[in-house]
């Protein structure tokens, strides 16, 4: 389930806001210029679906947001827990950075944690299946896919080189907990 927690950037122990309500999450994020939406597929997306099948299932929303924001390229990324490069991939964006274009992701499956650093606040957004997040360009943030990453996401780009991470060199990301998604409970 999606979740937003907001902290003072000097107090990673106690959230000032904590919600799993999609409308409340969207409302809070809108205050800092971040878009949060819930999408639903027009057709079932089965495990092992091709990128084209994934994009076809969300075509209306993809076309809408691409037209609204001027995206030129859309792709699908899929990361599984058994990926031999999972640690390297996770480490790539764990430190605070920004991009020179909006970072827009839609989670078709799985989850990940976007953490934004805006105006002395830290916004932890756990994105799960059916969540779209659009982080404005130059917003300081980091992303954690967890120790056993599992997600399929649609990514949107305006320029191929715009999505390069520009790292700040600060240690703030290390002050906040790493992402550890809840595992489903097994019946006893």
Curated annotation (Swiss-Prot):
Q: Its pathway?
A: Amino-acid biosynthesis; L-methionine biosynthesis via salvage pathway; L-methionine from S-methyl-5-thio-alpha-D-ribose 1-phosphate: step 5/6
Reaction catalysed by this enzyme: 1,2-dihydroxy-5-(methylsulfanyl)pent-1-en-3-one + O2 = 3-(methylsulfanyl)propanoate + CO + formate + 2 H(+); 1,2-dihydroxy-5-(methylsulfanyl)pent-1-en-3-one + O2 = 4-methylsulfanyl-2-oxobutanoate + formate + 2 H(+)
Task: Give the UniProt keywords, A-Z.
Answer: Amino-acid biosynthesis, Dioxygenase, Iron, Metal-binding, Methionine biosynthesis, Nickel, Oxidoreductase
Q: Into which EC class is this enzyme placed?
A: oxidoreductase
The EC number of this protein is 1.13.11.54, 1.13.11.53
Q: Which cofactor does it need?
A: Fe(2+); Ni(2+)
In this chain's numbering, which residues are marked as the site (May play a role in transmitting local conformational changes)?
Answer: 102
Q: Which residues bind Fe(2+)?
A: 97, 99, 103, 141
Q: What are the site positions for Important to generate the dianion?
A: 105
One GO MF term on file is: acireductone dioxygenase (Ni2+-requiring) activity
**HAMAP family from the UniProt entry:** Salvage_MtnD
Protein's job: Catalyzes 2 different reactions between oxygen and the acireductone 1,2-dihydroxy-3-keto-5-methylthiopentene (DHK-MTPene) depending upon the metal bound in the active site. Fe-containing acireductone dioxygenase (Fe-ARD) produces formate and 2-keto-4-methylthiobutyrate (KMTB), the alpha-ketoacid precursor of methionine in the methionine recycle pathway. Ni-containing acireductone dioxygenase (Ni-ARD) produces methylthiopropionate, carbon monoxide and formate, and does not lie on the methionine recycle pathway.
The similarity comment for this entry is: Belongs to the acireductone dioxygenase (ARD) family.
Q: What is this protein called?
A: Acireductone dioxygenase
- The organism of origin for this protein: Xanthomonas oryzae pv. oryzae (strain KACC10331 / KXO85)
Its organism's taxonomic lineage begins at: Bacteria, Pseudomonadati, Pseudomonadota, Gammaproteobacteria, Lysobacterales
The gene designation is mtnD
């Amino acid at each position: 389930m999606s979740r937003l927690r907001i902290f003072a950037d000097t107090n990673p122990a106690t959230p000032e806001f904590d919600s799993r309500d999609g409308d409340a999450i969207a409302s809070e994020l809108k205050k800092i210029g971040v878009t949060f939406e819930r999408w639903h597929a027009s057709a079932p997306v089965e495990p092992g679906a091709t990128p084209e099948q994934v994009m076809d299932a969300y075509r209306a929303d993809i076309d809408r947001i691409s037209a609204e924001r001027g995206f030129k390229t859309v792709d699908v990324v899929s990361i599984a827990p058994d990926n031999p490069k999972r640690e390297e991939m996770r480490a790539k964006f764990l430190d605070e950075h920004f991009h020179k274009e909006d970072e827009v992701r839609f989670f078709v499956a799985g989850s990940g944690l976007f953490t934004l650093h805006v105006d002395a606040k830290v916004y932890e957004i756990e994105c799960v299946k059916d969540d779209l997040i659009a982080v404005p360009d130059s917003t300081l943030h980091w992303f954690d896919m967890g120790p056993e990453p599992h997600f399929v996401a649609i990514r949107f780009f305006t320029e191929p080189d715009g999505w390069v991470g520009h790292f700040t060199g600060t240690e703030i990301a290390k002050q906040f907990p790493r992402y550890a998604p809840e595992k489903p409970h097994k019946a006893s």
